[in-house]
Swiss-Prot record:
Role, per record: Part of the energy-coupling factor (ECF) transporter complex CbiMNOQ involved in cobalt import.
Name this polypeptide is given: Cobalt transport protein CbiM
Lineage of producing organism: Bacteria, Bacillati, Cyanobacteriota, Cyanophyceae, Nostocales
Record-linked Pfam families: CbiM
Principal localisation: membrane
UniProt similarity note: Belongs to the CbiM family.
Organism name: Nostoc sp. (strain PCC 7120 / SAG 25.82 / UTEX 2576)
PANTHER family with a match to the protein in the record: COBALT TRANSPORT PROTEIN CBIM (PTHR43627:SF1), PTHR43627
UniProt entry keywords in alphabetical sequence: Cell inner membrane, Cell membrane, Cobalamin biosynthesis, Cobalt, Cobalt transport, Ion transport, Membrane, Signal, Transmembrane, Transmembrane helix, Transport
Chain's gene name: cbiM
Length: 261
């Protein structure tokens, strides 16, 4: 009986992922560019962000290997975290020239598996989007990965554990982790664009204020919506995948995640 229930849950999750992938790939509108588009950054800055992001990606591979070897049954949940990020970050609204606003979807995976594992999942999502959907690019993958797959997940991880420590309210912690990680992603993107293209008058500060101000118009409501959606997904996981959450020590009053920093 238990095997049949587990098989049914796995089948429904796989079907959900396949349907989401099909809808995004086959029915997506023409792209306006995902994050920073291919060729937009000067070569020096593109190389710089690649060098900054690579160590996190390598550490993330080691973290993922450790997680899957220790608990192979978590592979399906890892795939779900990646699919959640892929679907949410593919929902785009045009914003500043050379970029766009969208949810990031990295908060859930960061809470479940830690920021290092999420750095790999997020980078793979960005790679697939660049190759399959023409969102973002390969030269700018380092910059996009640093903002969405590294800075955002680390923020989500720390915010979640700090909120749990201060309030003990898990759903509030998850909402804040997802929302603020989304906002930080776009603060970092604004910094990256301002560094590459300082304003003739006012330099970096003026350029950052321009990029961040325009992003905020669409990103603040998107971030709040992402936080609410992440809480709904968390409730679903508690109902249908309690064994995995217990294995990760994320329910029954324990706030430690599978990966420690």
């Amino acid at each position: 009986m238990l095997r049949r229930v587990l098989a049914s849950k796995r089948a429904s999750l796989i079907l959900m992922g396949m349907l989401s992938f099909y809808i995004i790939v086959s029915a997506s509108a023409p792209a306006y560019a995902m994050h920073i588009m291919e060729g937009y950054l000067p070569a020096g800055w593109a190389a710089f962000w690649w060098l900054v992001a690579l160590p996190f990606m390598l550490l993330g591979v080691r973290s993922l290997t450790r997680i899957t070897k220790a608990n192979p049954e978590l592979k399906l949940l890892l795939a779900l975290a990646g699919a959640f990020t892929f679907v949410l970050s593919a929902l785009k609204l045009p914003s500043v020239t050379g970029s766009c606003s969208h949810p990031t979807g990295t908060g859930l995976g960061s809470v479940l598996f830690g920021p290092l594992a999420m750095s790999v999942l997020g980078s793979l999502v960005l790679l697939f989007q660049a190759l399959l959907l023409a969102h973002g690019g390969l030269t700018t993958l380092g910059a996009n990965a640093f903002s969405m797959a590294i800075a955002g997940p680390f923020a989500a991880y720390w915010i979640y554990h700090l909120t749990i420590k201060l309030t003990g309210k898990q759903r509030i912690a998850i909402f804040l982790a997802a929302t603020l990680a989304d906002l930080l992603t776009y603060i970092i993107t604004s910094v990256q664009l301002a560094l590459a293209f300082p304003a003739p008058v006012g330099g970096f500060i003026a350029s950052f204020a321009k990029f961040a101000g325009i992003f905020a118009i669409t990103q603040i409501p998107l971030a709040i919506s992402e936080g609410l959606l992440t809480v709904l997904v968390w409730n679903w996981l508690q109902s249908y995948s309690p064994q995995e959450l217990q294995l990760l020590k994320l329910i029954q009053g324990e706030s430690q995640s599978h990966e420690s920093i």
